[in-house]
């Protein structure tokens, strides 16, 4: 693996060849960092850790702290799945990321991963599901297809009266403790010599196409050779002109139902994760907090990640109760024990934005996780570190994640065009 000395030497070489001295190649004056990463969520947290592990001097900054309750990475749990319809890149990324999470779990020495079946309930093979089945065949990812009768035998706690079949992911799916794992990532980052600060950061001074400092809300400035903005749902607030028409930030709610006493049918590992292509929504078996279900929202409600109240919406609570009673008859009268309101930061085509800032050669943008970015954290960390350190990456992936490749969109709640 490239260490800091050889990286600086190589970068200087590359820079000399390119006739410019990239930021990190310049020995950082005094207390300057090689890299400052703004945002300690699933994207920024992993980017900072991987860069630190590669020997760089890294500062991780978050205005509210890692996995803070406003952040999209702060949910108790998130799902890891390889089922992505026709989007093969995310199927293979998810399969790789799952392997990385398993290694990290061993390193962290605590249980954060809960492997389970993931069932997609359907009545017809949509083009997206047909494409997914082919991708699973091509990537040799194991799966099963069970009809209604077989589903009733395998998962008797669920009602399949309106379901013809299910596509079942076997070894490529898991539930991950999201909030907990992001706190561990930040702890391990600091244990490995990374610096962490709670502060709101904005772009600071610049010389030509080189941003030299970040300005912090306490009036101080920090210098860094390179800067990564991994601000998730705050990216459009940070760069309104650049990101304002590229990402949409809207609410997403889910709730936890209390399982019956002494009854483990609705809990991991007996209860699989599921995605309902018929009624809508998805959920996981209980891991500590209850049976989780997120009803389909039937439309987007814009959300300001700083100021929005995280209180559940009545009509979605009703949709959730009706659904649980339908899909889990023995849970019809179960109490809702907890509710969560989070925000999704999605691009028009649901692809990530990982690219340099158009005005600065040493500034990186890493966001656009949408409703699916958490699982990819470890791989996003490696990928961005490779890009930032000038290591070869897949040009097709680079192109896919380019900011300019994202279609413009009309953000939810924004005034009519
Ligand atoms: C309800 C819901 C369910 C989801 N389910 C899944 C799932 O099952 N599987 C999956 O893989 N993904 C899922 N996702 C998506 C996933 O959670 C996100 O894609 C991912 O967490 C995004 O991480 P992030 O680091 O980009 O953003 P965040 O986690 O929001 O992190 C951004 C951080 O930047 C900080 N920040 C912002 N601006 C500044 C600033 N100026 N200065 C300092 N700090 C700043 C914030 O405090 C925040 O901590 C879900 C998302 C939601 C909302």
Predicted regions, residues:
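Core beta-strand elements of the Rossmann-like FAD/NAD(P) dinucleotide-binding domain
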Residues: 33, 217-226
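Glycine-rich FAD pyrophosphate-binding loop
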Residues: 53-72
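C-terminal catalytic lobe of FAD-dependent flavoproteins
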Residues: 330-417
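Flavin (FAD/FMN) cofactor-binding and adjacent substrate-gating region
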Residues: 2, 99, 125-192, 197-198, ...
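Active-site substrate-recognition segment that forms the wall
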Residues: 49-53, 109-114, 233-361
């Amino acid at each position: 693996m490239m260490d800091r000395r050889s990286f600086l030497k190589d970068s200087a070489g590359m820079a000399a060849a390119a006739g410019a001295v990239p930021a990190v190649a310049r020995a950082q004056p005094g207390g300057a960092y090689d890299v400052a990463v703004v945002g300690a969520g699933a994207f920024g947290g992993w980017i900072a850790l991987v860069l630190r592990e590669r020997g760089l001097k890294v500062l991780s900054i978050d205005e509210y702290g890692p996995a803070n309750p406003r952040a999209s990475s702060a949910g108790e749990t998130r799902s890891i799945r390889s089922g992505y319809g026709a989007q093969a890149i995310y199927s293979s990324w998810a399969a790789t990321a799952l392997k990385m999470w398993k290694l990290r779990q061993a390193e962290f020495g605590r249980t954060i991963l809960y492997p389970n079946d993931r069932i997609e309930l359907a009545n017809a093979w949509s083009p997206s599901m047909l494409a997914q089945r082919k991708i699973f065949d091509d990537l040799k990812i194991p799966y099963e297809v069970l009809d209604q009768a077989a589903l009733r035998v395998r998962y008797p706690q669920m009602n399949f009266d309106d379901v013809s079949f299910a596509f079942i992911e076997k070894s490529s799916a898991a539930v991950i403790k999201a909030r907990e794992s992001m706190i561990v990532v930040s702890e391990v980052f600091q244990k490995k010599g990374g610096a962490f600060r709670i502060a709101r950061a904005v772009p600071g001074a610049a010389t030509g196409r080189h941003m030299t400092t970040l300005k912090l809300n306490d009036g101080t400035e920090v210098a860094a050779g390179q800067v990564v903005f991994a601000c998730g749902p705050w990216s459009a607030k940070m760069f309104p002109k650049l990101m304002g028409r590229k990402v949409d930030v809207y609410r997403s709610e889910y709730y936890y139902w209390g399982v019956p006493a002494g009854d483990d049918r609705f809990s991991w590992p007996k209860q699989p994760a599921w995605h309902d292509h018929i009624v809508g929504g998805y959920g996981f078996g209980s891991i500590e907090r209850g049976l989780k279900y997120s009803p389909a929202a039937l439309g987007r409600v814009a959300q300001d990640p700083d100021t929005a109240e995280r209180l559940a919406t009545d009509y979605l609570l009703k949709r959730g109760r009706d659904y649980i009673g339908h899909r889990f008859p023995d849970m019809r009268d179960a109490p809702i024990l907890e509710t969560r309101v989070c925000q999704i930061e999605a691009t028009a085509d649901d692809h990530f934005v990982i690219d340099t800032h158009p005005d600065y050669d040493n500034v990186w943008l890493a966001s656009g996780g949408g409703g699916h970015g958490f699982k990819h954290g470890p791989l996003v960390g490696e990928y961005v570190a490779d890009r930032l350190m000038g290591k070869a990456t897949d040009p097709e992936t680079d192109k896919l994640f380019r900011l300019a490749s994202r279609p413009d969109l009309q953000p939810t709640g924004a005034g009519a065009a």
